[in-house]
Amino acid sequence: NFVDYPPTIHRIDLYAAPRTLDVVRKDFDYAFAQDKYRGVPEIELHEIDVTRPFSVKGVEILPVSGHHSERFAVTGFRIGRLAYLTDFKTIADAEVEKLTGLDVLVVNALRFAEHYSHFNVAEALELIARVSPREAYLTHMSHDIGLHAETEPTLPPHVHMAYDTLEIEIND
């Protein structure tokens, strides 16, 4: 059946390192075609240097580098007093220093058991202890982590399990 999609109303601005942009162009080539069909997302790519801060609509964003595995670099972001790190397995001390003074840290914690390319809960809690944010949220969790109602009470009081539709209020 033919679906008559409305024209794209909102453009998606995507900020990423050159390597990531190359993957996006390849995996979503239809979004960058000369003649797009209706309903295809309108994506505007913005190349960033992960070693330098950049600005989006007047808001400074500080890239935080880490590794997903030995050979695969990842980038998290600090925006004001919030930082978002996902797919991290390791982070250098110099990058951890970028996280001082946070109100909120969102960090991946795949499961309790060790994993080769993601922080487990113990590793995430270790990073949280080093950074000392006012609050921390665990994200990128697998089903192995257990039920929210059973697992969250085992965490330190300022550490929470994130969930879909969670909204975090940040006061500057």
Where are these regions (language model features)?
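Binuclear metal-dependent hydrolase catalytic cores
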Residues: N1-L85, E150-D172
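Binuclear metal-ion centers of metallo-dependent hydrolases, dominated by the metallo-beta-lactamase
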Residues: T51, A92-D172
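Thr-Gly-centered strand-to-loop micro-motif
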Residues: P63-V64, L85-D87, V107, L138-T139
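Pre-active-site segment of Zn-dependent metallo-hydrolases
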Residues: N1-P7, T90-K98
